């Protein structure tokens, strides 16, 4: 009887450990993303879900590494603070890898590299090719982006206004409150090409001077999560999965 009891107790302990392991394995990775960074991350009004390049990448990474993801939408400027406060485990957005950010965030291998785009009112027919063409003007940029400091440090502009979202900048360009706006080229190009802002145009001949690479961010020191993300990304780059996702969103 005693042996039978010990066998049952041992089996129960193993079952409990197995269930605990399953719970940990199935625990979702919380991903902070923005609802206004199309095509990288945006709110799909048809599904009421956050979609885009970074979401597709995180889903593929999770599938490869055996974890589910849970998207938490928030404004771009609050992403790092949310990560540091452990409100999210990962940042998946159009976030440049910069030395300043690397002081508080550990980034994955670079995913895509691009520069800033300039947009102005459609009725403004001037051929803008550089920042100097806007010398003495009021311009707009999204708060929290890597463009704020270099634009300020350039000393070219009368004033630099910061906004929560790119649509907010576009609105003020259309209203004549600012002369032009700077934003991630793929994001603003995608939004304008969708035809939702007929009063705004891209400065097609503008040459970007602030290139950067986008990566996935994790909390400083979270090597376990970072290693999983990088392992999956390297597989995906090797087998063409990353390029396929980028191509689906018009970036290849």
Indicate residue ranges for each PLM-predicted region.
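Periplasmic-binding protein-like
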Residues: 35, 113-117, 193-234, 251-252
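A ligand-binding cleft/hinge motif common to bilobed small-molecule-binding domains
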Residues: 94-103, 150-153, 179-210
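Short helix-initiation/N-cap motifs at beta->coil->alpha
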Residues: 55, 70-81, 126, 161-175, ...
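Flexible hinge/capping segments at coil-to-helix
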Residues: 121-138
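Extracytoplasmic small-molecule ligand-binding "clamshell" domains
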Residues: 26-95, 103
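Alpha-to-beta junction loops
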Residues: 66-68, 85-93, 137-138, 174-187, ...
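Ligand-binding cleft/hinge of the Venus flytrap
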Residues: 41-44, 58-67, 144-165, 192-197, ...
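Extended ligand-binding regions for polar small-molecule ligands
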Residues: 55-65, 137-138, 143-145, 213-252
């Amino acid at each position: 009887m005693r042996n039978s009891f010990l066998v049952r107790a041992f089996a129960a302990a193993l079952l409990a450990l197995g269930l605990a392991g399953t719970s940990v394995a199935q625990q979702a990775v919380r991903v902070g993303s923005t609802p206004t960074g199309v095509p990288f991350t945006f709110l799909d009004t048809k599904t009421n879900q956050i979609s885009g390049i970074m979401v597709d990448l995180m889903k593929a990474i999770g599938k490869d590494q055996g974890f589910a993801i849970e998207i938490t939408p928030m404004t771009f400027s609050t992403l790092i603070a949310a990560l540091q406060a452990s409100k999210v485990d990962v940042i998946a957005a159009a976030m440049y890898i910069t030395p300043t950010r690397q002081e508080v965030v550990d980034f994955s291998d670079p995913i895509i590299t691009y520069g800033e785009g300039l947009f102005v009112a459609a009725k403004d027919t001037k051929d803008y090719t550089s920042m100097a063409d806007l010398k003495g003007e009021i311009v707009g940029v999204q708060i929290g982006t890597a463009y704020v400091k270099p634009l300020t440090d350039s000393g070219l502009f009368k004033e630099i206004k910061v906004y929560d979202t790119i649509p907010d900048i576009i609105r003020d360009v259309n209203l004549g409150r600012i002369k032009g706006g700077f934003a991630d080229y793929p994001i603003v190009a995608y939004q304008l090409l969708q035809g939702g802002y007929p009063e705004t145009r891209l400065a097609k001949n503008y040459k970007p001077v602030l290139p950067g690479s986008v990566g996935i961010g994790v909390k400083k020191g979270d090597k376990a999560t970072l290693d999983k993300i990088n392992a999956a990304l390297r597989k995906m780059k090797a087998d063409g999965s990353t390029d396929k996702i980028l191509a689906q969103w018009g970036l290849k």
